């Protein structure tokens, strides 16, 4: 990262973060086609940096501090990616946003400038996201099926009712066991 200019650094950190959040969400979500479609592909509802930040925070996958840092990075990224003008991380509004970032929790040296601050802060954050994603997988902390079916009221002949209920129970059992197999 040290060889990148300011724009390259910001865009790279944002792209790495967006990708890491997408992987975190996929690791956490049920392992099915619908989950992948939420994250990947054209017009995916959770395909943007902003939506991934909000989804991870609302699901409890990132802390409030991490959420705030990612939102700051997103705002800084937008300034660099939506402008052809010569802008800098030393510009007053961008500099204030960088100063508002949390300090790296794995580096004991105080950053010398805004370039080092954002690089170290977001690099630390990316490591934390990677570790959390790994722990979700290792400790089987994936989302679990909580939906259920309800059998209310009966009509028709007794034998038909019993057979219908048995089919429903078997279907529920299959739903639950197929999900359990995916998390092992």
Please report, for each region that a protein language model flagged, where it lies by residue.
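Amphipathic alpha-helical interface elements
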Residues: 1-182
């Amino acid at each position: 990262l040290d060889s990148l200019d300011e724009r390259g650094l910001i865009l790279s950190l944002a792209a790495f973060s967006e990708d890491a959040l997408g992987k975190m969400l996929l690791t956490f979500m049920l392992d099915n086609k619908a989950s992948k479609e939420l994250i990947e592909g054209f017009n995916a509802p959770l395909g943007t940096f902003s939506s991934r930040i909000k989804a991870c925070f609302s699901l409890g996958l990132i802390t409030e501090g991490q959420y705030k840092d990612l939102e700051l990075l997103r705002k800084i990224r937008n300034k660099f990616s939506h402008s052809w003008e010569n802008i800098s991380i030393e510009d007053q509004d961008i500099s204030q946003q960088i100063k508002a970032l949390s300090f790296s929790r794995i580096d004991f040296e105080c950053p010398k400038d805004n370039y080092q601050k954002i690089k170290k802060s977001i690099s630390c954050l990316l490591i934390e996201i990677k570790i959390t994603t790994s722990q979700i997988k290792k400790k089987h902390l994936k989302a679990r099926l909580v939906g259920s079916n309800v059998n209310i009221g009966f009509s028709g002949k007794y034998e038909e009712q019993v057979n219908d209920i048995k089919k429903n129970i078997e279907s529920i059992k299959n739903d639950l066991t197929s999900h359990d197999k995916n998390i092992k």
